[in-house]
Amino acid sequence: LIMKLKVYIYKNCDTCRKAGKYLDNNGIKFESIPIREEPPSVKELNMMLNIYKGDVRKLFNTSGVDYRSLNLKEKLPKMSIDKAIDLLSSNGNLVKRPFVIKGTKGVVGFNESVWKNLFL
């Protein structure tokens, strides 16, 4: 059984396009999911949180409009992990993208050397 790569993307995001092209060029099949319409689940977010050693800020799109308009730079340090995860699961714009899951592995953002180790 081959684990399918789940890639949450936003179609107008350059980084997401680069990531998709990278996967295509390397012959890696993946399921593309629109992050705004279908944000990652609480379960997936918690799994990713474990991968990033509990650093919830790493899961946030800190350069996004919603992050700034919700003043999360100030609020996030005082927020409970559960509340932060709920926020992410209810607003795909807040999630760092691409948000990628393969079985129990995962990664946010696109970094070619990291992806090479994980997926090739």
PLM regions and their residue ranges:
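Thiol/selenol-based redox catalytic cores and closely related redox-interacting motifs
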Residues: 37-120
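A structure-centric signal for secondary-structure junctions around beta-strands
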Residues: 2-4, 95-96
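Residue-level detector of intrinsically disordered terminal segments
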Residues: 1-2, 47
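Local sequence-structure signature of Cys/Sec-based thiol-disulfide redox active-site neighborhoods
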Residues: 3-26, 30-35
